Every structure is written in C-alpha cells, then in structure tokens.
Amino acid sequence: MILTVGNTKGGVGKTTLAVNLAVARALQGKEILLIDGDRQGNSQMALSIRAEGGRQPGVACAAAVEGPALRSLVQQMKGKFDDIIIDVGGRDS
C-alpha cells in the first residue's frame, strides 16, 4: 500500500496521523517506510525520538523528499516495503 497523508493547511494533524499509522502497521508485522515530505522534518524527528527511547518496532524513514526525487524514491522502494506512507507538508498555515 502506498498512502499519502496530506492537506494544504498546516497544523491539522498530518504528521501525527502518518507517524501513528506507520507505527500501527509496523506493530502488525509490516515493513514500513515513512517518507517525510515536509521540510520541517517532524515525522523523521518523531521516529528518531521513538528509536532513541528503544521503542519497538522500528520504522524506516526517508527525510524531506519532494518532487521528482519523491516519485523516484517511491518507485525504488515499493518492492522492498509492505507499505509506504508519505507525510506531505502543508502549504497554507
């Protein structure tokens, strides 16, 4: 499954939903890649804090990727993970 969590407005919970969905799917035994497409990098930061605390299971994360690089990364990784979850940044806060 490839899932994008997005909204044009910032602060509506996109990152919270993306991170929690990634962790929930990982707890179900799925191999997950969370792509942090927001320049703020909050998804990556949340997963880093979780990993530093020793929380399992771990979730792979790719940092702030957008545009053609995002498309290329998804194409490259879609066969390596059960799910790819993309947290895209808001444009209108």
What are these regions (language model features)?
Residues 1-93:
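P-loop NTP-binding core
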